[in-house]
Amino acid sequence: MRFFIEELPVVFPYDFIYPEQLAYMRELKRGLDKRGHILLEMPSGTGKTISLLSLLVAYLTHHRAEKHKVVYCTRTVQEMSKTMEELKRLMLAWHRTVGGSAVIDDGDTQRSASDVKREASDGAAATALLAAGVGKTPFAAGRRRMAESEVQKGSLGGELTAVCLTARKNLCIHPEVSALTYASEVDAACRIKTARWSGGTSKCQFYHGDIEDLAPSFTLPPGVHTLQDLRQLGEARGMCPYFAARHAIETADILVVSYLYIVDPKVSPVVRKHLRANSIVVMDEGHNVDDVCIEAMSLLVSKSDAQSARDSNVKMLQDALEQAKTHNRQRLQEEYDRLVSGLALTRLAVSSMSGAAREMPALPGVGDGGGELDALPASLRHANQFVTFISRLADFFYRIISRMTQPQTADPSTFIAKIKEDCNIVDVTHLRLTTDRLQVLLNTLQLRDLYAMRHLVIIADFVTLLATHYKDNRYALPGYVVIFEPFDPQDAINRPDPVLRLSCVDASMAVRGLFEGHHTVVLTSGTLSPLDMYARMLGFVPAVAKSFPMTLSRRCICPVIVTRSTEQADLMCEDLTSAYKVRVDDRLQSGVSRAYAGLLLQLAQTVPDGIVCFFTGYKYMGEVMLNWYHSGYLRELSRLKLIFVETQDVAETAEALRNYRRACDIGRGAVFFSIARGKIAEGIDFDRHYGRAVVMFGVPFLPPDDRPLKERLKWMEAVLGITDSEFRNFDAVRQASQCIGRVLRNKTDYGMMILVDRRFSLPDKRKKLPGWIAQQMRDNTNLSTEACVSIARDFFVEMAQPWDQMKDLGRTLFDEAALATQGAMVQGSEPPELAARRHATPLAIGAPIPTAAEGGGRFPAAADGSAMDGPSRPIRAARDPTGTEQRRAAAGAKRGRGST
């Protein structure tokens, strides 16, 4: 369908649209027009991705002269692929709606939505259909003339170029390199085969020089290029898909990338250097963006890293340097001459790299063109002197880590001063150049195995990052802390393995340049409550911030909170929790496990198809399941549904997920045990029969003894005013909301959301739930396990009744006719409620409050007819617009008082 958001013509690839999608696009356009940052929370399953893409493509097309570029960030490769498929379907709709209408007759017939979906899933088939003129929609004469005008002006949406950018592991087509298992191995092998000095059989046949040197024949044509399309195009043209995508960054209108291409200082320059100030950056599923920033800006050096750097990597450098002095001293002299001539070090580092090695750039703040950063001291220009310095640095790290016996925390300035003293460095700015100088030397010496040098590289990155950010001009406290730990926290056995952490405590550090350098950054997700928390943590002021309610014609989601067991004699209400005081008490924990098992067994008999259960962590899940095994609950549960478990092995988890889906497909039913913050909780949808109920056992709090987290919480309380308990509650609820939100993918879907822990019913937790979940929770916030099962039975009986979605037209579902009543089919119009609100006269005293349908309230009407005065507070709409019943009730009360 085609409609207007004010003056903006929007093409939507489906025949129907939700009210939430329409409201979402209006707020998005309002933020784009303001050239400000946008913070939007939209309910899960209401088409957030396609709404974003539809509005952005329309905006790019309408404002083509301004040359906007959209960078769409996702978390996983699977989400990237789904986004590209949606974008391809949208481009097909543009051709059918705008491009096709200019050349077809009114007698042409329209394909069904299912045909369009099937045809759009294959890029080649879609292109062939468009070339043949098949499946084009007839429009009225006025709309036809508009389409012809847009085609003549060159504003057709189909001319946009969209490309996805990901790691070599996902794009490489070299038979040997692509067969490697790990991404780091693929990167190292690619750099070897694309190095300038590689030749003969070791040279990659798909690599044709640096990105800047690629011929025009390697330029991607307009259209949507998915990962599969890039690989097929590379095989057909004999070119590397990875470098073809990199080459297209500058000319592409839409880039779909992972978060790391925006926040990781090692790879973000690849994209950021091509962005203009008017670029639009979208962070989809941005509820964990602060954690992504913290992880990207933090580094860890283990004792084995420091030892390998000192004993192995430094020796490799020294041997290669001696060999170069013997056989090719000219290369070393040329390197020195270029450094002495004043050539900026970062530009020299990049120019000396091979095409593949260019993805090892400077860290943030390095190489900005400033004189002090590019002025390399004389003591580091000679290769001999730099190798001596890097040798001292590696030895310093090894000595520091080896001596640690107790956890310690150091201020960045103190640690920098110690490095300067031990390594004989005068100016701290010289340390900022460590990574770039090492990269220049590695390429000068033509070392092939860069993967083996990773231990020394991480130490150089550590020093560079610390020297760049050891002071912060924005806040009083620095955004980094150096942490010594005698045990690696990732080692479950707690073997003595000391590590040195450079821990980032300020999440805004990774995106500060993004928010300051670009007009619009869109942060959106289904779980962003409370909205102000993200603005405070990331250090920006949103121009538009809104949480949308969910309009439902039937109650297709049923969130409940279970706080107590039916075994009142053995287990009291306050003990049904995963709190530490309960877990360390064997009697209480046994009762909690028994209550969990009783609830799950009854749900397995009530809930059809699939049930997904989330625990707070692997350890807690193991303890509970071990108790169930010894008690016989697992055996009894397996008779009702098959059991699958997420493990820490990626391959095992993927296989378990495949078999779980298969069990649901054949009607056997299954239960999938997973953990919050795990692989399944993020990005895996359990729509339709794959997830008719999601159970969250316990509150997924962050570990209390995590030292980097403690330092981050101290920093946030001192600088941002966010207390320890406030952030822990916020993080736990957003993780739980993300888990239970997996159950709903569209309004025709349905499922139960069950939170099993008494702490979820506390106000400090419940008020942080997304508004669209709290809106449907009603009074189900203090249930026993038996009451929960009773509600589940009633819910699934109700969902089993026949339901015609077409009855929702005009209320929770809009077609073109319904959009016409909203004023969306006329260019430049506005919704009736907004016009009525602007032209409304002031209310007289005693006048009835208008309902949501009449324009009252700041938010759209909720499913039960109530107006939403905020993201999670429904206010009952007036049911007596004339005030008659109110006067009668007052008169009756007066008579009653007189009679007494």
What is the role of each PLM region?
Residues 2-11, 15-16, 63-255, 260-263, ...:
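A substrate-engagement module of RecA-like helicase motors
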Residues 1-41, 54:
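Conserved pre-motif I regulatory segment
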Residues 29-30, 49-65, 85-90:
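Walker A/P-loop NTP-binding motif
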Residues 227-252, 263-273, 421-578, 592-594, ...:
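A contiguous, basic/glycine-rich beta-loop/short-helix subdomain that forms a polymer-engagement track
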Residues 563-591, 644-762:
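Conserved RecA-like P-loop NTPase helicase motor core
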Residues 513, 569-616:
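Conserved interdomain hinge at the start of the Helicase C-terminal
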Residues 613, 618-647:
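Conserved helicase motor "Helicase C" RecA-like lobe of SF1/SF2 P-loop NTPases
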Residues 275-306:
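SF2 helicase catalytic motif II
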